[in-house]
Regions:
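Low-complexity, acidic/Ser/Thr- and charged residue-rich accessory regions of DNA metabolism proteins
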Residues: 293, 332-382
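Glycine-rich, often acidic, oxyanion-interacting loops/wings at catalytic, nucleic-acid
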Residues: 146-248, 376
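Short, basic/hydrophobic alpha-helical segments
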Residues: 44-69
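Short alpha-helix plus adjacent loop in nuclease-associated cores
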Residues: 93-136, 190-192, 294-303
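Gly/Thr-rich phosphate-binding beta-strand-loop-beta motif of the actin/hexokinase/Hsp70
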Residues: 2-28, 119
Length: 382
């Protein structure tokens, strides 16, 4: 844990990032008020020069070695700035924006200056040991960050595929046609279709449908290309720890190559000390509510990785289908029985939480979830 050094004075920096400008708030030892410096967005040379200048002036004034600790909010800029500053000897923290404690007034002022000064106060409190003021993001390595690209790109392509298919169905539905033509026999099926009032498909609509078909075919080809790249990466790095976990998850019946890759690259590549940490990271822990004589759990926090959370909810439903003899599936049936609706949806989240913990233990220790069926062979190790 990084704390304020009481021997060597420390300069605290908070960087408010935007596309056009960066606002740097600096708290220099010996000065009461923070100093604000505005530089062009992305001008790292100016930022490093500013840091060096602040260090040099503080060192001359105090005749001591000056260290620098900075922070900025996680967002669209990613983590490259963190790596750059770290490489230049600056201790850098990335703040989780939604975790910062704020004033709960109905209307709050919002300016870059207030945000930068607020981050500066949060950073100072965090370095003093008050970790309730905000949460810090664990910065992935460049390799870990790049490994997520494949399954995230596939997710976007699948969404694009669904959008195109829904658009084709919607256009046909406006003409009273409820059947979508097959891609394999597109021309023949489209020529045979008739509108609800007996006409052929209008010329411009036919042209738009043909263009949508070409987009759909290209999207399907890209999905296959991304999946092949994913499979090839697992084959070329069989000793890699992440690839080993993907292969292990793929052995469990009901978990496919894509789910195994998503869970490993998004969750299991990290180290967790206990089950509460991993459930909190995915955001499927219930939020306690205790006041006076009332003490109950409310909805899940949803404060973690949304992609991993969605995957676990989907996997929980699939677990009931493909692992009906497991202890987790039996627990779900005993708890829910024949109930449906809201009760069943609440219980599936609890099942997802238990399943996540069981899979985490499996990838770390090799202990198979109780009653789960394991595939005899792995046809595709990815």
């Amino acid at each position: 844990m990084q704390t304020i050094d009481t021997v060597n004075p420390t300069i605290l920096l908070a960087i408010e990032l935007s596309a056009s400008t960066w606002l740097v708030a600096a708290r220099v030892p010996g000065l009461e008020k923070p100093h604000l410096h505005r530089i062009d967005g992305g001008d790292t040379a100016a930022l490093l020069a500013l840091i060096s200048s602040l260090q040099a002036r503080a060192a001359r004034r105090l005749d001591a070695t000056i260290s620098v600790v900075c922070c900025f909010e996680a967002g669209r800029d990613g983590f490259w700035l963190h790596r750059l500053l770290t490489a230049h000897g600056v201790v850098c923290h990335v703040l989780e924006p939604t975790s910062i404690l704020v004033n709960r007034r109905a209307r709050r002022a919002k300016t870059d200056r207030l945000d930068a000064e607020g981050m500066l106060r949060v950073l100072a409190a965090y370095l003093r040991g008050d970790h309730q003021t905000c949460s810090m993001v664990r910065v992935p390595t460049p390799e870990e960050e790049d490994a997520k690209r494949t399954h995230r790109e596939r997710e976007k392509l699948v969404q694009e595929k669904l959008r195109i298919e829904n658009r084709i169905e919607a256009l046909l539905f406006t003409q009273g046609i409820r059947k979508r033509p097959s891609l394999r026999s597109w021309e023949r099926d489209l020529a045979a279709l008739r509108t609800g009032d007996g006409r052929e498909i209008p010329r411009h609509l036919r042209a738009e449908l043909d263009r949508l078909r070409r987009r759909l075919i290209m999207t399907l080809e890209l999905i296959r290309e991304v999946e092949a790249e994913r499979d090839q990466a697992a084959k070329t790095k069989p000793q890699d720890q992440a690839c080993h976990k993907i292969a292990a998850l793929s052995r469990i019946r009901g978990i496919g190559e894509n789910f195994a890759a998503v869970l490993t690259r998004e969750v299991f590549y990290r180290s967790f000390d206990n089950r509460r940490q991993i459930a909190s990271y995915v955001g499927i822990t219930p939020m306690p509510y205790q006041s006076g004589g009332m003490d109950r759990d409310r909805r899940i926090s949803r404060a973690g990785n949304p992609r991993a959370r969605t995957t676990m909810i989907q996997l929980a439903w699939l677990w009931l289908r493909y692992q009906p003899g497991s202890e987790l599936a039996e627990w779900f049936r005993e708890r829910v029985g024949t109930l449906a609706g809201r009760t069943r949806r609440i219980a599936i989240v609890a099942l997802a939480r238990k399943l996540l913990i069981a899979l985490w233990r499996y990838t770390e220790t090799g202990v198979i979830p109780a009653g789960a069926e394991i595939r005899a062979e792995i046809t595709v190790a990815a």
